[in-house]
């Protein structure tokens, strides 16, 4: 049985876990005393143009200026008489002192400021509104086959405002055109409110704050395969119920329950130990093998070891079976630890080319469950595979990563 567990008893931390039986498969954590800025929208002011980087630095109201690269500037800011957009330089588009509406794409990290974009996105239950992307009619890459074909027809019937675009989310599959239009209308109204706020306020300032972790998780993860939603805080329970009522999600209202047990919620469902295990460098595999996860400034390295693995009658078969088993666990660890950036996997050497291709295919398959954008390479002659993953940015996971990195230096 798949469940969503919302642990909101602690004053400074709110945690949401998704479990299948007793196995944790996704985790969202928010520290209440730490600001969440990702996806917030600001009215900012250009403070410096850097031609050598083809980027601008934007004061959006925080201590560090944000970084706005040329590729993240929508054509709304381009000169009206421009006929060749591809050869424009940033100094021909933006000027120091100019005001702009920006959204945080990546949180600031270390000495680096936040990565900004002018391609605003407003996520709804079933679709994403892109107000600066004219004529965009996108469908989630995870939607395939007949569902994709059916949604292409529905998109053409939706009343999308001129000069705006949309992307249908996986949760939009099977929804009626009326439901999708209602969600779209709500996002459009939200965008007009944001624009109005930008008109009446002086830069730099916050003009739209992303929803809290409870609403975000319900919006992004709530699907019909979730059979129970269990909350240990009555106030959060009512917040979730109100959201479901407002979004016409009556299907889930019967599934949400208040937890009143004497044991802590996560301990009762035996996932606290799984969360604590995310601090460990070594992850054991059922067959006796293991994966070792090391964090560096440049990349994350994942090493697969056969150790005491009993899967196989010879070296080649043991290597293939251990690698195959490790791939599923690696995909799970990427989600739970929210590993982002460059990731290098060191597989156990396999001499059979067919085995290497099967491992690559298996990795692609298990990564389809990941909400983050992922790019995967091929296994090299040295047994290494390079991939990149979008960091979705849970604060506690970042703290865990920093803790591990410091421990490795000791």
Curated annotation (Swiss-Prot):
Enzyme class: hydrolase
Cellular localisation: Cytoplasm; Cell inner membrane
Positions contributing to Mg(2+) binding: 303, 346
Keywords attached to this entry: Cell inner membrane, Cell membrane, Cytoplasm, Endonuclease, Hydrolase, Magnesium, Membrane, Metal-binding, Nuclease, RNA-binding, rRNA processing, rRNA-binding, tRNA processing, tRNA-binding
Catalytic activity: Endonucleolytic cleavage of single-stranded RNA in A- and U-rich regions
PANTHER family (UniProt xref): RIBONUCLEASE, RIBONUCLEASE E_G-LIKE PROTEIN, CHLOROPLASTIC
EC numbers for this chain: 3.1.26.12
GO annotation terms (biological process): rRNA processing; tRNA processing
Cellular-component GO terms for this entry: cytoplasm; plasma membrane
Gene3D superfamilies in alphabetical order: Nucleic acid-binding proteins
Domain of life of the native organism: Bacteria
Cofactors demanded by this protein: Mg(2+)
Subcellular location, principal: cytoplasm
Similarity comment: family membership: Belongs to the RNase E/G family. RNase E subfamily.
Every S1 motif domain range: 39-119
Membrane topology of the entry: Peripheral membrane protein
Name listed for the protein in its UniProt record: Putative ribonuclease E
Function as written in the Swiss-Prot or TrEMBL entry: Endoribonuclease that plays a central role in RNA processing and decay. Required for the maturation of 5S and 16S rRNAs and the majority of tRNAs. Also involved in the degradation of most mRNAs.
Assembly and oligomerization: Component of the RNA degradosome, which is a multiprotein complex involved in RNA processing and mRNA degradation. Within the RNA degradosome, RNase E assembles into a homotetramer formed by a dimer of dimers.
GO-annotated molecular function: endonuclease activity; metal ion binding; RNA nuclease activity; rRNA binding; tRNA binding
Cofactor note text: Binds 1 Mg(2+) ion per subunit.
């Amino acid at each position: 049985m798949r469940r969503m567990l919302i642990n909101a008893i602690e004053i400074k931390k709110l945690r949401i876990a998704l479990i299948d039986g007793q196995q944790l498969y996704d985790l969202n954590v928010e520290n209440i005393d730490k600001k969440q800025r990702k996806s917030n929208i600001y009215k900012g002011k250009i403070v410096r143009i850097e031609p050598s980087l083809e980027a601008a630095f934007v004061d959006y109201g925080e201590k560090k200026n944000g970084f706005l690269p040329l590729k993240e500037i929508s054509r709304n800011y381009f000169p009206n008489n421009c006929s060749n957009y591809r050869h424009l330089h940033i100094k021909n588009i933006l000027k120091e002192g100019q005001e702009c509406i920006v959204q945080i794409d990546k949180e600031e990290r270390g000495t680096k400021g936040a990565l900004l974009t002018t391609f605003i996105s407003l996520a709804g239950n079933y679709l994403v509104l892109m107000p600066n992307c004219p004529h965009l009619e996108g469908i989630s890459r995870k939607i395939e086959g007949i569902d994709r074909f059916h949604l292409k027809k529905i998109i053409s019937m939706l009343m999308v405002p001129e000069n705006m675009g949309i992307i249908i989310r996986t949760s939009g599959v099977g929804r009626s055109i009326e439901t999708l239009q209602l969600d779209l209308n709500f996002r459009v109204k939200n965008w007009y409110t944001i624009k109005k706020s930008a008109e009446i306020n002086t830069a730099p300032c916050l003009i739209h704050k992303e929803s809290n972790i409870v609403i975000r998780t319900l919006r992004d993860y709530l699907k019909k395969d979730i059979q129970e939603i269990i909350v240990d805080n009555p106030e959060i329970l009512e917040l979730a119920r109100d959201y479901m009522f407002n979004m016409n999600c009556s299907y889930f209202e019967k599934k949400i329950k208040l937890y009143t047990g004497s044991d802590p919620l996560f301990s009762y469902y035996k996932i606290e130990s799984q969360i604590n295990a995310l601090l460990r460098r070594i992850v054991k595999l059922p067959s006796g093998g293991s994966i070792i996860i090391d964090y560096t400034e440049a990349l994350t390295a994942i090493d697969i070891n056969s150790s005491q693995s009993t899967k196989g009658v010879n070296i080649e078969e043991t290597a293939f079976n251990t690698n195959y088993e490790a791939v599923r666990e690696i995909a799970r660890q990427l989600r739970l630890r929210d590993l982002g950036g460059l990731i290098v996997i060191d597989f156990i050497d396999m001499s059979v080319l067919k085995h290497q291709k099967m491992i690559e295919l298996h990795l692609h398959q298990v990564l389809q469950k990941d909400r983050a954008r992922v790019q995967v390479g091929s296994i090299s002659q040295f047994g290494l595979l390079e991939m990149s993953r979008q960091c979705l940015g849970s604060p506690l996971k970042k703290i865990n990563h920093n803790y591990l990195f410091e421990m490795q230096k000791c």
